[in-house]
Amino acid sequence: MSKKSDKSGSGKTGVGVGDGQRRGDRMRERVKTARGRKLSSTRWLERQLNDPYVAAAKKDGYRSRAAYKILEMDDRFKFFKPGGCAIDLGSAPGGWAQVAAQRLGAKTDKGFVAAIDIQDMEPIAGVSFLKLDFLDDKAPELVRELAGRRADIVMSDMAAPLTGHRQTDHLRTMALAEASAWFAFEALKPGGAFCAKVFQGGTSGALLNDLKNRFGNVMHMKPKSSRKESVELYVIARDFKG
């Protein structure tokens, strides 16, 4: 921290050396902040350019690298069966919905995918998009009416906007996971599955107990396609008891 200087400059201007220093300090802080933003943006761009899943998503026609996470989890747990019904909460930009539509046969067979988001989402062949808040009490009923049946899987890749404070980010994303689970309880058919993003630290005790009471099998998984530095995990619950 710079020491305060005596105002020994010309009294005619009304600006002392101390005022000039403070202005200089403020300007340097602005420059440092601007540089930090530029460096952060550069690092993000470098990470994107060097990420094999970003390149693969462009090549394979997926809207986001997140598509490979649900592909990996489905390869292991077999969520998507041809002719089944899936609900994607917080679906934009649509990577998970794309995978669900492909694997359920939503374009040609009797598979059905409902994608829900409060943001706009570009249309996807075989996907029925609903622009609404899934927290609305009537949302599960609206989706059931649209699909004409209950879902085989309810999935959510939602995360709250990051604040940089780890505990706050964890709690906010956990709140979304809990709300998604309650939606699933209303929308799933017996034997169905639930998959949602959480952060390291795992699922809260209350939610974990609810899931264990409602499903036959509950576990966590971090897909290989998740970035190594990411704190995300996925809670996977199968064999819904109804």
Language-model features: locations:
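Conserved SAM-binding loop of SAM-dependent methyltransferases across substrates and taxa
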Residues: 93-108
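Class I S-adenosyl-L-methionine
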Residues: 200-242
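Short glycine-dipeptide loop
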Residues: 83, 107-110, 188-193
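Conserved class I S-adenosyl-L-methionine
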Residues: 81-92
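S-adenosyl-L-methionine
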Residues: 109-112, 116-163
